[in-house]
Amino acid sequence: MNPENRPIRSIFTVMSTAIRTLEKEGRLTMEKSYIPHGSTSVYEHSVKVAYTSLYFARRFRLNIDEKSLIRGALLHDYFLYDWHEKDKSHRLHGFYHPSTALRNAKEDFDLNPIEENMIVRHMFPLTPIPPRYKEAWILCLADKYCATIETLFPLLMWKVL
């Protein structure tokens, strides 16, 4: 069956497998301790962004690498610190956290070029270099969509257990 024809409910199966793998091999669960937008943890945000990215890709029948899309989306904010703390290294977080996330992800996982590009370019246009791959463009849109909802309308987003 073509990826675009798979039922949306299978997104949860694909995602849960990827999440378990990243939790086992790296520090993904540390993201539960940090709150980037509203009251949503980085972990919850990353799961929502991965789900939304895959939903968009399937809904619009885009020919993409689903595994890379999910992994890149789950790791896009893998910076592993609380950027709200009074610390000079956290200034200009929006500009610098993609490179920190990429460095941390490379320490814990073997990334392919699509995943690397997704992580380091997800803040476009705040960071001026655009994404190179379709998966990274999808992530940019899904991340901004989820962050906006989490910040302005937190009750509209579901809670990740």
Which residue ranges define each predicted feature?
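Metal-dependent phosphohydrolase cores
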Residues: 1-161
